[in-house]
Swiss-Prot record:
NADPH binds at residues 89-90, 256-257. GO terms for biological process: queuosine biosynthetic process; tRNA modification. Substrate binds at residues 87-89, 227-228. It catalyses: 7-aminomethyl-7-carbaguanine + 2 NADP(+) = 7-cyano-7-deazaguanine + 2 NADPH + 3 H(+). Residues 268-281 have a biased composition (Basic and acidic residues). The active site is at residues 188, 195. The keyword Hydrolase does not apply. This is NADPH-dependent 7-cyano-7-deazaguanine reductase. HAMAP family: QueF_type2 (MF_00817). It comes from Vibrio vulnificus (strain CMCP6). One of its GO terms (molecular function) is preQ1 synthase activity. Catalyzes the NADPH-dependent reduction of 7-cyano-7-deazaguanine (preQ0) to 7-aminomethyl-7-deazaguanine (preQ1). GO terms for cellular component: cytoplasm. The gene is queF.
């Protein structure tokens, strides 16, 4: 259980509670979660050691045009890691559902409403794209870059989070490389539902021991935090124990409620080169 799972800032969330589904536009449904909750635990100050965004894909975005004809789209939202808040996912889903029976004059009006409401909730300007299904169908399904570390023949008996599994993980050899794993699994901070993801780690520094890294990632299996918080924890732990010169951590989680979340944290750039989905998304 997270150290801050009982924080008062989480008490009013709709997550884990029975809720009604509104079908008329209602921006008040959005609920923020202060990023400071886990960043205080990670001892992160105002000067963050990373750049980045939380990239959301909205697969269930629909509204009515001015004549009442339903429209469907796939949305992409980029929320800066520097924003005061992350957006709680169930509230995001409920908010998007509120578009379903609401008439809008144009796709651009929908995009601008999303920008305004999500920026207000996050506490900083967000970027939004609203794409046609035809456009999205033309996008590729990709895999992560670099070496997959999942096929190691090792025994694991503990699934409790332990950052000390990274102790001594940095070797002597200096490398520039990319590693990835599809075995990332954590649990929702509130509901304990499983969150399934893949994570890509790109770095320049002393070569990271594959076994230690895999054991560390598997230790998230019974850990309770939101997606964004897990990625920041991975980033800060790798910086603490391995001290790379440069580091990028990019996780892509499977969708729930028509949404997937893809947190990106990097010393090098604020956004990934692309937002193509993976096979499990």
């Amino acid at each position: 259980m997270s150290k801050y799972s009982d924080a008062k800032e989480l008490a009013g969330l709709t997550l884990g509670k029975k809720t009604d589904y509104a079908n008329q536009y209602d921006p008040s449904l959005l609920q923020p979660v202060p990023r400071s909750l886990n960043r205080d635990d990670l001892q992160l100050g105002d000067e963050l050691p990373f750049m980045g965004h939380d990239i959301w894909t909205l697969y269930e975005l629909s509204w009515l045009n001015s004549k009442g004809l339903p429209q469907v789209a796939v949305g992409e939202v980029y929320i800066p890691a520097t924003s005061a808040n992350l957006i709680e996912s169930k509230s995001f889903k409920l908010y998007l559902n509120s578009y379903n029976q609401t008439r809008f004059d144009s796709w651009e009006e929908v995009r601008q409403r999303l920008i305004t409401d999500l920026s207000h909730c996050a506490g900083e300007a967000v970027e939004v794209a609203v794409n046609s299904v035809t456009h999205y169908t033309q996008q590729p399904i990709v895999t992560m870059e670099g070496e997959c570390i999942d096929e190691q023949d090792i025994d694991i008996s503990s699934y409790d989070f332990d950052d000390r599994l990274l102790e001594g993980a940095a070797g002597e050899e200096w490398v520039t490389e990319t590693l990835h794993s599809h075995l990332l699994k954590s649990n929702c901070l509130i509901t304990n539902q499983p969150d399934w993801g893949s994570v890509e780690i790109r770095y320049q520094g002393h070569k990271i021991d594959r076994e230690k890294l895999l054991r560390y990632l598997v230790s998230f299996r019974e850990h309770n935090e939101f997606h964004e918080q897990c990625v920041e924890r991975i980033f800060t732990d790798l910086m603490k124990y391995c001290q790379p010169e440069s580091l990028t951590v990019f996780a892509r989680y499977t969708r729930r409620g028509g949404l997937d979340i893809n947190p990106y944290r990097s010393t090098e750039q604020a956004k990934p080169d692309h937002n193509h989905r993976m096979a499990r998304q």
